[in-house]
Amino acid sequence: KEFECDGKLQWPELIGVPTKLAKEIIEKQNSLISNVHILLNGSPVTMDFRCNRVRLFDDILGSVVQIPRVA
């Protein structure tokens, strides 16, 4: 495995959840996450990997549409 990160690393149960609530849940469940970015689905992102970052991709209604994961 190329990257080793501690704590919970993905949240499939947050699909369909409002992104602001999902952000709070992620930060509560993994205190090592200090960067939660909310992005419209399809937005371009950098390819660098960080153990402290999760990207939340949402739709125009503000609900999570992709599994949030450390990236």
Curated annotation (Swiss-Prot):
Name of this chain's protein: Chymotrypsin inhibitor I, A, B and C subunits
UniProt-annotated site: Reactive bond, residues: 47-48
Sorted UniProt keywords: Protease inhibitor, Serine protease inhibitor
InterPro entries assigned: Prot_inh_pot1, Prot_inh_pot1_sf
Disulfide bonds, paired cysteine numbers: none
MF terms (GO), sorted A to Z: serine-type endopeptidase inhibitor activity
GO BP annotation list: response to wounding
Family designation: Belongs to the protease inhibitor I13 (potato type I serine protease inhibitor) family.
Species for this entry: Solanum tuberosum
Regions that span the bilayer: none
Domain of life from the UniProt record: Eukaryota
This protein's record includes keyword ATP-binding: no
Function in brief: Inhibits both chymotrypsin and trypsin.
Consequence of substituting residue 24 to G: In components B and C
Keyword Lipoprotein: no
Subunit record text: Heterogeneous tetramers of similar chains.
